[in-house]
Amino acid sequence: MQRIIGVEVEYGISSPSEPSANPILTSTQAVLAYAAAAGVPRAKRTRWDYEVESPLRDARGFDLGRMSGPAPVIDADEIGAANMILTNGARLYVDHAHPEYSAPEVADPLDAVIWDKAGERVMEAAARHASSVPGAPRLQLYKNNVDGKGASYGTHENYLCSRDTPFASIVTGLTPFFASRQVICGSGRVGLGQSGDEAGFQLSQRSDYIEVEVGLETTLKRGIINTRDEPHADADKYRRLHVIIGDANLAEMSTYLKVGTTALVLDLIEAGVDLTDLQLARPVTAVHHISHDPTLRKTVALADGRELTGLALQRIYLERVSKFLDREADRDPRADDIVAKWAMVLDLLERDPMECANILDWPAKLRLLEGFRNREGLAWSAPRLHLVDLQYSDVRLDKGLYNRLVARGSMERLVTEQQVLDAVTNPPTDTRAYFRGECLRRFGADIAAASWDSVIFDLGGESLIRIPTLEPLRGTKAHVGALLDSVDSAAELVDQLTH
């Protein structure tokens, strides 16, 4: 299987020494501190190229109007605008009041795990460097999606899809899937409702913030299916499915199955497999009901009158993917591995969700919380449980509860720590992220700006030179590796590419 995938995570941020600190300011400090520690001075830090971005274009065929206002800030060090492009092809920047790591494009779900996990190491270093600045507040970063005060911030997935596939088919095929996949990839949350005031535990941190079936916006009226039509690639050939319903995962199996199963269901949809019989009667309500039931026994209503659990819905998707793959002449090892792990996890969850406490986030978190509740005699309404929930997602290797579970062998990993550390500084080799990252590594001082689909060189002439990268599977090591090795300067590279 080969589908371009990208994961972007807004991290929670706090300053224990200065609780009233402005999060936009502290997020800016984190990004700038990481840049300084990486030895990238302000004058040489590549800017993000916003010219080709169109975040208000809707896949349903219209643009959401943007109210007139001041021009966007262009000073990359201004508060709230800090940005850097990393040599691994990722983007590290301030998005609203959060530091965000947007991983480079990958073509394999396991690589999505590796470069997403690399983002955790980047953020841990960013907080550490920012906190070491004399007089600066101590920062802590969390890979989660809620602040405990009613606000949610996103972990977004991106999948490159064929423009030929009707968007209505994507909505039909994915809505029941997204509603039910949280049984596997929910990260777990103490509290019910957006503010978390109602006592209890639920599967997903994001579900209570889903309010409509389909929508363009990502900060209010969030939809099960997001309609942003901004492919960051050849728009005549591709669309980018922008997924906002997912949680920030720490468990590698959760991330692997989250992106891997979604990619396989997209294969079904693009092949024209009929999934209309799985339509939900009340999709938004189903999202909430499935999340609020850690027993996994409650059912949701389908449009045809059937009642199914989230597990049962996932089982149907698994069966249809398996049947689809059985028709393929050449078996794909990655697809087979995802299907095998998908089936294994569903079997374990059906028998006892706690059997997944060493591989999935929400059961791991629930086991920690239940142990703490039993030792301390706490009800689910106890405020201390919210602190345990938060500490699970702390990115510090010695403090975060998830990381401590890994250290003592209580959470299984799918990748090695060396693979993750290599990915902090190196790009994937089989997507255009390789070209972007290697250009930054070799010729960073000569690059004025970059984006997902272009690299802009400043060679000292009257005009900047934009090299488009509209094909995500070009610009790979196989495609441009020898060329990059054969040139000694950015000018020579640009000359080779343009003549």
From Swiss-Prot:
Pfam families: Pup_ligase. Mg(2+) 1 binds at residues 8, 93, 100. Its EC number is 3.4.-.-, 3.5.1.119. Pathway: Protein degradation; proteasomal Pup-dependent pathway. This is Pup deamidase/depupylase. The lineage of its organism: Bacteria, Bacillati, Actinomycetota, Actinomycetes, Mycobacteriales. Belongs to the Pup ligase/Pup deamidase family. Pup deamidase subfamily. Its cofactor is ATP. The gene is dop. Specifically catalyzes the deamidation of the C-terminal glutamine of the prokaryotic ubiquitin-like protein Pup to glutamate, thereby rendering Pup competent for conjugation. Also displays depupylase (DPUP) activity, removing conjugated Pup from target proteins; is thus involved in the recycling of Pup and may function similarly to deubiquitinases (DUBs) in eukaryotes to prevent or promote proteasomal degradation of certain proteins. The active site is at residue 95. GO terms for biological process: modification-dependent protein catabolic process; proteasomal protein catabolic process; protein pupylation. Keywords: ATP-binding, Hydrolase, Magnesium, Metal-binding, Nucleotide-binding. ATP binds at residues 6-10, 102-103, 158, 240.
